[in-house]
C-alpha cells in the first residue's frame, strides 16, 4: 500500500457533481485511501445522491455547506476538518472531482510530498500537448507570465492537485479568498512566507470539454490576473 494512502487526507470540494465524481471516489477507495474529506459546497437536491453514496463508505467524511460558499471556502473548511479529525495525518492532497486528476498522479504527488517533507507539491499539466482547449492554453500562459513578474516560475498556475504538508494547513486556512482566487492567493502567500514548492508532472486530461468543472478559463484567468496586478502594486 502506498504511504500517502494512509498518511494523507484527501480534500475534495464539490458543487453539483456528476458521475465523474463517483468514478474519482471509486479510484481513491480502490487505491486504499483511508481518509477522504468531501465538502459539498451547496449542491442542489438533484445532485445529493452522489454525496449520499459517499457517506456509505467509512473512509469518507462529507461536510455540507448551506449554500454555495466557493471553492476557497470549501478548501479551507476541508483543511480545518483534516486537522481536527485526523491528528496523525502528515498532510492533505487537494483534488477536483471532475476526473482531471488521475489516481496514480494523486498518489505520486502525495508520496513526493511525504519524501520532501517541507515542500508543497503541485501536480502540473502539459499545456503544449495536442487536444488541450485553446482557452485553457491562453489562460495558463497569461497567468504564468504574471506569476513570473512576482518571482514565481510555475508551469500550471491553475492546478487543483496540491499535496500540502500538515505544518502549513493552519496558515493556509487564514489566506484570503473564498472562491477560485483563493488558490492564487495561496501561491502568493507561499512566496511571501518562504514556503517552497515542487512541480510533479501529471497527465493532461480534458474530456468532453471538462463538463463538470466550474472553472471558467477566460473569466477566472482574468480574475487571477487582476489579483496578480494588485499584489505587484502592493509590493512596490
Please name every model-derived segment.
Residues 1-4, 19, 26-27, 149-151, ...:
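Hydrophobic helical membrane-anchoring modules
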Residues 40-51, 99:
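A conserved acidic beta->alpha catalytic loop
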Residues 66-69, 73-81, 103-180, 207-215, ...:
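Acceptor/aglycone-binding surface of glycosyltransferases and processive sugar-polymer synthases
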Residues 33-43, 63-65:
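Short beta-strand/loop segment that forms part of the nucleotide-sugar
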Residues 33, 87-89, 117-118, 195:
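Short, high-confidence coil segments that cap the C-terminus of an alpha-helix
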Residues 8-17, 24, 31:
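A conserved hydrophobic helix/loop-capping motif in glycosyltransferases and polysaccharide synthases
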Residues 16, 41-45, 69, 78:
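Conserved short acidic donor-positioning loop in nucleotide-sugar-dependent glycosyltransferases
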Amino acid at each position: 500500500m502506498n504511504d500517502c494512502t494512509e498518511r494523507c487526507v484527501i480534500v475534495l470540494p464539490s458543487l453539483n457533481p456528476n458521475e465523474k465524481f463517483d468514478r474519482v471516489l471509486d479510484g481513491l477507495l480502490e487505491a486504499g485511501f483511508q481518509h477522504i474529506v468531501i465538502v459539498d459546497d451547496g449542491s442542489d437536491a438533484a445532485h445529493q445522491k452522489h454525496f449520499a453514496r459517499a457517506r456509505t463508505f467509512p473512509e469518507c467524511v462529507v461536510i455540507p455547506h448551506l449554500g454555495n460558499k466557493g471553492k476557497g471556502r470549501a478548501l479551507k473548511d476541508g483543511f480545518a476538518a483534516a486537522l481536527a479529525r485526523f491528528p496523525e495525518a502528515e498532510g492533505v492532497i487537494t483534488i477536483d472531482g471532475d476526473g482531471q486528476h488521475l489516481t496514480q498522479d494523486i498518489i505520486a504527488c502525495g508520496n513526493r510530498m511525504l519524501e520532501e517533507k517541507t515542500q508543497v507539491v503541485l501536480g502540473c499539466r502539459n499545456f503544449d500537448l495536442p487536444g488541450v482547449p485553446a482557452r485553457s492554453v491562453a489562460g495558463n500562459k497569461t497567468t504564468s507570465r504574471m506569476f513570473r513578474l512576482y518571482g514565481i516560475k510555475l508551469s500550471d498556475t491553475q492546478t487543483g492537485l496540491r499535496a500540502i504538508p500538515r505544518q502549513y494547513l493552519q496558515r493556509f486556512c487564514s489566506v484570503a479568498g473564498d472562491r477560485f482566487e483563493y488558490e492564487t492567493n495561496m501561491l502568493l502567500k507561499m512566496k511571501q512566507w518562504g514556503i517552497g514548492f515542487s512541480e510533479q508532472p501529471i497527465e493532461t486530461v480534458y474530456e468532453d470539454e471538462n463538463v463538470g468543472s466550474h472553472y471558467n478559463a477566460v473569466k477566472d484567468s482574468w480574475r487571477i490576473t487582476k489579483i496578480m496586478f494588485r499584489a505587484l502594486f502592493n509590493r512596490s
